[in-house]
Amino acid sequence: LDPKLVAQRMMGWTDARTMPTAERLQALLAPEDAAAPASGQPYPFFLASPMSGEVHELGSITEWQAEWKWDGMRAQIVRRSAGISIWSRGEERMNDAFPEIVDAAESLPNGTVLDGELLASLPNNLLPFSMLSRRASRKRVGKKILAEIPSVFVAYDLLEAHGKDIRSEPL
């Protein structure tokens, strides 16, 4: 059994609302072909790390890729037959805190997983991380919070398309 598959299945495993059962353990350890990605499980998050070598060791600048460092919360949007889930890198499901993102994700094709950043944003103005954090900590988001601290999702990677894991494919 591929350890990466077990790691993916373990995302959200510690959900306090779900009791451990023999069935959940069997699903965790099931052969790869027996567990199609129909659930809302995200992929393990890969975080950036500081460069350990010298800049000249990176090769030609024409081969480089860079991403903007947003002041938001890393998240994955999972759109599969089981529905839509927004996951934090801390393995928390955040659907209740970001209902407008869930609504927008309805337009994604089934079998899509996006990696990106949740941001608090007014038109033409990103809001501070502290406001996003305040919103994310709420179990229920009312109209006032939706108006004061609207959110957007900036996707920077497509991890799954049409139900196929494409993380190992070239950009």
Predicted regions and their residues:
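N-terminal nucleic-acid-engaging modules of covalent nucleotidyltransferase systems
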Residues: 1-171
